[in-house]
Structure formats: C-alpha cells, structure tokens
Amino acid sequence: MSDVELVLRSTRVITPEGTRPAAVAVAAGKITAVLPHDAEVPAGARLEDLGDDVLLPGLVDTHVHVNDPGRTHWEGFWTATRAAAAGGITTLVDMPLNSLPPTTTVGNLRTKRDVAADKAHIDVGFWGGALPDNVKDLRPLHDAGVFGFKAFLSPSGVDEFPELDQERLARSMAEIAGFGGLLIVHAEDPHHLAAAPQRGGPRYTDFLASRPRDAEDTAIANLLAQAKRLNARVHVLHLSSSDALPLIAGAKAEGVRVTVETCPHYLTLTAEEVPDGASEFKCCPPIREAANQDLLWQALADGTIDCVVTDHSPSTADLKTDDFATAWGGISGLQLSLPAIWTEARRRGHSLEDVVRWMSARTARLVGLAQKGAIEAGRDADFAVLAPDETFTVDPAALQHRNRVTAYAGKTLSGVVKSTWLRGERIMADGEFTEPKGRLLSREP
C-alpha cells in the first residue's frame, strides 16, 4: 500500500457487493483496494473524507450526440463533456450523426478524434454509423476502435445519415455479426410513421399521434427476427413504447442477443404534462403517457430493459419552434440525468444501487469497458460524489451544455453532484472545472 496516493472515505460507498462504509485507495489512476472505513491512511497519501455523501462509480453514458465537428453551434466536446462532468458522468460514447462529417469511415473517425483530443473533460469513445452504402467501411471502423454501429430504420432528420431498409439492414447486420460487432438501432418503422396522421402545429397530442407505438413495435419485431436469424448482437436504442416489452422479453428468453436502453425523459416526464407548443419536450420516439411510463419502470426492475442513457441531442434554441412537426427533436440531459432518475427511482422504491447498475455497470458492460462501471480493485478511479437528499430547482442558466434549453426547467430534483473524479483526479467540484483531462477511448479487443 506504500504507493497509494489518494484515499476517498465515505460512510456510503456503492460497490458491486452493496453499499457500505469504506475507504477507497487510489494509485496511478486506478483503484487499488476497497478498505474498511476506519483503515489507516498510508503514509504520503491524501485523504478526502466525504462524510455521508455517497461515493459511486462514475456514470457511463453510451448515447450522446456531441455534434462536433460541423454543428458546434448545437454542441461540442468542450461543452458536452463539462455538462457530463457536472452530472457525475465520467465516460460518454458519441453518436456518429449530427456531426459533419458523420462517423461512417475511418477518415471521418480520425477527423472527429482530432477535434475531440484537447477538449474532453471526461473520457470519450465513438460509435460508427451503418449507412446504405458503407458496408465496406464497417470492418475497418471496427478495427479502428469504434464500439459498434448505429443504424436508423426511419429518416434520421439529417440528410447525411440515411436510414436502412430491411434488405440493407440484413446486409449490414450480417457484416457486423461476421466480425463480432454490435449493431445499435433507432427502431421506428417508416411505413407506420407514413401512415400516421401528420397534422403539425403546437398540440402535443397531435405530435404523439404522429409517432405511434406500433411504429416502434413493428421495427423492433423485425429487428429481433433478423438478429435471431443471423445470431447477431443488437441493441435497441431509446425504447419508448411499453407495448414492445413482451416481444423483447420473449426474444431474450429464446436466446436472442439483444439489449435495450431507455432514457431519463421517458422515465421522468409524461405526455400529460407537456404544454402545447413546448418543443423542448420533443424527441423521437416521443415521451408517452404515464401508464406507459409505469411499465417501463417495471421492465427496468425485471431486467427486460438493461440500462438508462441520456440520448443527449441538443440544438440551437431557434430550432425549438412551437410547431412539433418542424421543431428539432432532441432533449439535452447530460447534466441532469442522475438527479432526474434518482428523484423518480427513489419515489418508486428503488435504491441508488439500482441507479448505478442501470447507468454505470450495465452501460460499461454494453460497450466492453472492463475498466469502468464499478468501485473495485483494478478499475479506473472514476467517481461521482452525490448528496442524495439535497434538492435543487433546475435553472437553465446553471447548465453547462451549449444551448441551455431543457425540459426540466423549474423542476425540483433530488441528488446534488458535489464532485466528479476521473482516474483519481477531481475534475469538477461544486460547479468548478479543471482543464480537460479526458482520454479518447477505443473498443477493447
């Protein structure tokens, strides 16, 4: 223990074995031991006594749109990673679209990595994209270290990232399965969307009718059938429709290699509360009714849904018009995801251990980051320090993402992130940040 540089002591440390008083020893950016709370601090080590604040593993958010380069007026690595650090997130994986260029070739990946290199306050990895015409690029991107490949089954909203039809989905899936990769999918069926009423305007009920549950359900059913046929590993992005849960549970029981995520906005906001014209609540698939939300929480509890991620997808404020048909669809959630989920999870009888499992352990496992997602010896010393009983009212002016539009404005949330640590260095404390210390991550072989 003579090489220990730092000891973080708390009466509540969340480990894979549960929550207990402990002292966490850190050396060279790694956790070296989880010791009894009253363990003697090694000579030369610095002690950080956190009192009763909870020490939890840094969160791993595998669904973030940073939009850099190309649409940095929407977001960027500097602002997105500061917002993440403010929310206790220590690792994010950036989506391949909304940046220019999209991450669909090795050259484009290199461009994005070059841009991110000196701007990342936390660790950053990258997804690749699966397009109708880039099957030849998938294996090279895999070899270059992307964590998997995103595909849309309906229009993405940006011209440079077209969707896959069923034939091209099968072709891309077969290619990715052939080298053991992961395909992650925005699952809404374009035919059901085209058949739905498209009234436009400010009424949220009209927007909700334009993105029906059966669009998700059909797309997911088709995805699961293809995955079963090809023995492919697939991941359903941002599940909103609870009607798809029996399909997913059945596929898992049959051994289909599928994982599923949902998002804080689906778990904490409801269609009934969305004011007309309030497009800060717009996302696709949409926020649905309270009864639907109850079923999503049940699915999290029973394991049908694996994890919770933000789908942070910002834009400039002028794109959030009062017409739901034309307003940009995306919710910015990096900074508020932990308190938003904790507030609702606690109300429903869940523990912080559950939240850590959904937002850190399982997300790290999804992308194969064996050094992340838990407080145990050998892992990266990435932590969030949370005061779970403290409350705050969301003030958009206090948010760190570039365009301070939020669906949570004025809401009172529980859980204040006091500090965030990356490889044993405190990168955020009480809203103050160090210079960027994040690294760019590649898929571990």
From Swiss-Prot:
One of its GO terms (cellular component) is cytoplasm. Its EC number is 3.5.2.5. Carboxylation allows a single lysine to coordinate two zinc ions. Gene3D superfamilies: Metal-dependent hydrolases. InterPro entries: Allantoinase (IPR017593), Allantoinase_bact (IPR047604), Amidohydro-rel (IPR006680), DHOase/Allantoinase_Hydrolase (IPR050138), Metal-dep_hydrolase_composite (IPR011059), Metal_Hydrolase (IPR032466). Keywords: Hydrolase, Metal-binding, Purine metabolism, Zinc. It catalyses: (S)-allantoin + H2O = allantoate + H(+). Its cofactor is Zn(2+). Zn(2+) 2 binds at K150, H186, H238. Binds 2 Zn(2+) ions per subunit. Zn(2+) 1 binds at H63, H65, K150, D311. NCBIfam families: allantoinase. Homotetramer. Belongs to the metallo-dependent hydrolases superfamily. Allantoinase family. This is Allantoinase. It comes from Streptomyces avermitilis (strain ATCC 31267 / DSM 46492 / JCM 5070 / NBRC 14893 / NCIMB 12804 / NRRL 8165 / MA-4680). The gene is allB.
